[in-house]
Amino acid sequence: WHRALMRLDEGDYDTVLAEYDQSLWDPKSDEYLDLCNDASLLMRLELHGVDVGGRWADVAEKCKARTNDHLLAFIDVHFALTLAAIDAPEAGELYASLAKYGEDGNDDNAPISAEIGKPLAAGLIAYKQGDFGAAVDYMVPVRYALPKMGGSNAQRDLFAMILLDAAIRAGRANLARALAAERLGRMPENAWTRAAHTRAFAA
């Protein structure tokens, strides 16, 4: 997966798609980490402007039956993104279930789901529905709290990319420029970051 991210930044999209199809996507696996990695790579490809074809639908089919699992907020938001990518009604069902779990759950994950999972899932769903302003409004307040949700820095970086792209698309110029400048300071050699910085300051 990390090798695919390196190829992605190099712009070798055909190789990344081939690696996804041949190595990363496992039709037999329902392992949550596999599904999260699949969703993350597909979304990153789209952020790079790559058409991923029908690949979202294959991942979404595995997520549809897991809208009430709530193992980790980190997993739920990836499932929400995947279901929203194909405009599946289960995206809304997952959000409603997640909201209820955040209120009523009695394990350690419930308050994290309420604080971070619920607004982040709402933001990702809004993003996939093309409501970029709403995506920004949901995601900005929780952007610094994401480490509580789990996952590695590389895994969580997807949400920073989506927020920056949403801010640009929503015409939130000041926010987009601030996010882009902050990101460029952290990763000046990253091709997507440089391109997003150019987009933000051209708006």
Predicted segments with their positions:
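Helix-coil-helix junctions within alpha-helical repeat/solenoid scaffolds
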Residues: 5-203
